[in-house]
């Protein structure tokens, strides 16, 4: 709960620190995506707007949080990644925090479904295979 608020608070603090040292303004990019009708409250356009407002009132310069994928679902992102030549082995989705994807958490399930919906082979090595399980 509220983990994106915590992550972005750290990112704003880091961006502020970089700005104070180098006078280089930073933009903060997040990978929020659409989950159909089930968006998490801290991955919405309203949340991004609120974080931008928080940055304006709490930092010495105006930082912008950007969410370029916010209207795309996993399938769209995987197809875009393929088009851009992304090595999906180097991407990570799992919530559990191990070195490998667990295969059971919601993020792992959505990752597998995204590759399935995009008709792409999932190159991910999962600790637990849930190929027959559904979300």
Which residue ranges define each predicted feature?
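Nucleotide-activated chemistry modules centered on ATP-dependent adenylation/adenylyltransferase
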Residues: 1-135
């Amino acid at each position: 709960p509220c983990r994106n608020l915590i992550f972005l608070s750290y990112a704003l603090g880091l961006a502020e620190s970089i700005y104070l040292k180098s006078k280089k303004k930073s933009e903060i990019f997040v990978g929020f995506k659409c989950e159909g009708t089930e968006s998490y409250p801290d991955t919405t356009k309203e949340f991004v707007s609120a974080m931008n407002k928080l940055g304006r009132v709490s930092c010495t310069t105006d930082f912008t949080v950007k969410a370029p994928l916010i209207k795309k679902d996993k399938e769209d992102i995987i197809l875009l990644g393929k088009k851009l030549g992304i090595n999906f082995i180097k991407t990570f989705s799992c919530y559990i925090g191990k070195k490998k994807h667990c295969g059971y958490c919601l993020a792992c399930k959505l990752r597998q479904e995204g590759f399935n919906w995009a008709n792409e082979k999932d190159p991910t090595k999962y600790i637990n295979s849930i190929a027959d399980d559904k979300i």
